[in-house]
A protein has these predicted regions:
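N-terminal secretory signal peptides that target proteins for export/translocation
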Residues: 1-12
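Non-catalytic accessory segments of hydrolases
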Residues: 2, 29-190, 214, 455, ...
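Bacterial N-terminal signal peptides
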Residues: 11-26
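Serine-hydrolase-like catalytic core of hydrolytic proteins
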Residues: 97-283, 315-350
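Short, solvent-exposed turn/loop segments enriched in Gly/Ser/Thr/Pro and often Arg
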Residues: 167-170, 220-224, 423-430, 491-497
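Surface-exposed patches in mature extracellular/periplasmic domains of secreted proteins
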Residues: 215-217, 280-285, 419-423, 487-494
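Substrate-gating cap/lid region and adjacent catalytic-acid/histidine neighborhood
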Residues: 244, 252-257, 281, 285-464, ...
Length: 531
């Protein structure tokens, strides 16, 4: 009996020893295969899933805390040894503003200036094209850790994908007279845009170590990220840091939802805001406040959350973007840009009313006076369906489409590089049959571009959705590679020129190029709103 027990313990001991050795071997194998890269600040170790090497949460600038709050980003601190880069960095301070952003709880950290790099695990190119993503969120929300913006699938198209966090809301865009005085160039605000610029400088200095080409960088973004792309094109500070640009829904033009106001206007407005809500007005007092107190004062429910945004500061933006593009002073790079078919809901234009023929007439008279009849020819209201569609179209035009069109139009007049325009028409199908059908709504294209359809669980994804996602990843990465989205097996996407009738690529279950049949509408709106 004792011998039998001894044998059993001996056998169990061998099994345990085997498991321990297997674990040690597995850990050693993982450690040996974990990719390492030496950046200017120090070595980083990422993770390898067999398809992509991911390096997450790499600091690209000094933490903007304490006396560095509301200052342009400084150099990232150096470190010794190997820094683990296997987890996303903290998201920047923000409140809960958008229901579709389910990636985090409100809050975050001021120490948030990190970026992520996704590199194809196997590639033959000596230098890979680089795509730098700028998230949207109205300049008040957003983070790189949102799953639908994960670059691991897109990188498998043979590109390096980079994404960065940047300061938001009051932390990224406060304008104050004392900030202008201490700046050295009499400017204030736009710290979030300067963060983006610092990330681009980091890419320029470090991406070669990851196998990327610093001379072939494409910036791309959606909504506020697209506004940012147009602003980086307009900024003389960004010259030479990127060679191509992709804008998805938005630009720093026209009466968009995110207007870039003059410095003097913002100084007065922001001072009233901070004094009224915080009871302090001196810069030293504001810098001494806890970050959470600042956030709580300007985030829902205390505010709608949109009190602070970019301004024409005289430094990052010497003039408004339309003036810079109009004079041909922009960073002239190849541009791919467009918007979604259903960018805005009725509430943007008609809240609290529902659209009807009479309310459309009232709106036309209010907005365009003696040109109301011309407006109604462009937005017909002769049937209930036309009223519904025209109300949606006008809401989307006011919110996003017109500003994006004006950006494309300005670049076509003074730029010399090719332009490709699209309209995203694919309407995701809700899994819940009782859920509202929102069409090709604002931001709907993000999952397709990144190949992250499965990140959105409340949608029933069809084979047509997956096919379009595959095409869009190829179009976007081809454009990043060569400045031309076309490639083998893809429907032809002609450049945006008057010779071909200003063609627009409709991205749907049957992607195809069409002549622009809405040009008169945008010419009318642009001319009227310029008055």
């Amino acid at each position: 009996m004792n011998m039998r027990i001894a044998r059993r313990f001996f056998a169990l001991g061998l099994i345990s020893l085997g498991l321990i050795l297997m674990t040690i071997t597995s850990v050693a194998a993982w450690a040996a295969s974990a990719p390492q890269v030496k950046t200017k600040s120090g070595a980083v170790e990422g993770r390898d899933d067999g398809k992509v090497h991911a390096f997450l949460g790499i600091p690209y600038a000094a933490p903007p805390v304490g006396d560095l709050r509301w200052k342009p980003p400084g150099p990232a601190p150096k470190w010794t040894g190997v820094r683990k880069a296997t987890d996303f960095g903290a998201h920047c301070m923000q409140g809960k503003v958008f229901d579709d952003m389910v990636f985090h709880d409100p809050g975050g950290s001021e120490d948030c200036l990190t970026l992520n790099v996704w590199v194809p695990a196997k590639h033959s190119a000596a230098k890979l094209p680089v795509m730098v993503w700028i998230y949207g969120g109205g300049f008040v929300a957003g983070t790189t850790s949102e799953k639908r913006q994960d670059g691991s699938h897109l990188a498998q198209q043979g590109v390096i994908v980079v994404s960065m966090n940047y300061r938001l809301g009051v932390f990224g865009f406060l304008v104050h007279p004392e900030l202008a005085q201490e700046s050295g160039h009499n400017s204030a605000g736009n710290y979030g845009l300067l963060d983006q610029l610092a990330a681009l400088e980091w890419v320029h200095e470090n991406i070669t170590a990851f196998g990327g080409d610093p001379g072939n960088v494409t910036i791309f973004g959606e909504s506020a990220g697209s506004f940012s792309v147009s602003a980086q094109m307009a900024s003389p500070l960004a010259k030479g840091l990127f060679q191509k640009a992709i804008g998805e829904s938005g630009a720093a033009f026209s009466r968009s939802g995110l207007s870039f106001e003059p410095l003097a206007v913002r100084e007065e407005k922001d001072q009233k805001l901070v004094t009224g809500k915080l009871g302090v007005s001196k810069l030293a007092e504001l810098r001494a406040l806890p970050a959470q107190k600042l956030l709580d004062a300007f985030a829902p429910p205390q505010s709608e959350g949109f009190d602070f945004g970019p301004d024409v500061d005289g430094y990052f933006l010497p003039e408004p973007a339309p003036a810079i593009f109009g004079a041909g002073k922009q960073n002239d790079v190849a541009l791919l840009a467009g918007w979604n078919h259903d960018e805005g809901g009725f509430e943007i234009t008609f809240s609290p009313q529902k659209p009807a023929a009479d309310s459309m007439k009232e709106r036309a008279q209010k907005d365009f006076g003696d040109k109301a009849d011309q407006f109604l020819k462009l937005y017909p209201i002769d049937t209930d369906e036309h009223v519904r569609r025209s109300a949606l179209d006008y809401a989307g035009d006011r919110f996003i489409a017109l500003s994006t069109w004006e950006w494309i139009e300005a670049q076509s007049k003074t730029g010399k590089q090719p332009i490709y325009r699209y309209r995203f028409d694919m309407a995701p199908t809700p899994s819940n049959p009782n859920a509202p059908r929102l069409g090709a709504y604002h931001s709907a294209e993000i999952e397709y571009v990144f190949g992250q359809l499965d990140s959105k669980a409340d949608v029933t994804w069809r084979p047509e959705d997956r096919q379009l996602s595959d095409m869009m990843q190829k179009y976007w990465s081809n454009f990043a590679r060569s400045g031309n989205p076309n490639g083998p097996g893809l429907p032809n996407w002609p450049a945006y020129t008057s010779t071909d009738g200003w063609p627009v690529m409709f991205l749907s279950d049957q992607p195809a190029a069409h002549k622009d049949d809405l040009r008169d509408r945008y010419l009318f709106l642009s001319a009227e709103w310029a008055k």
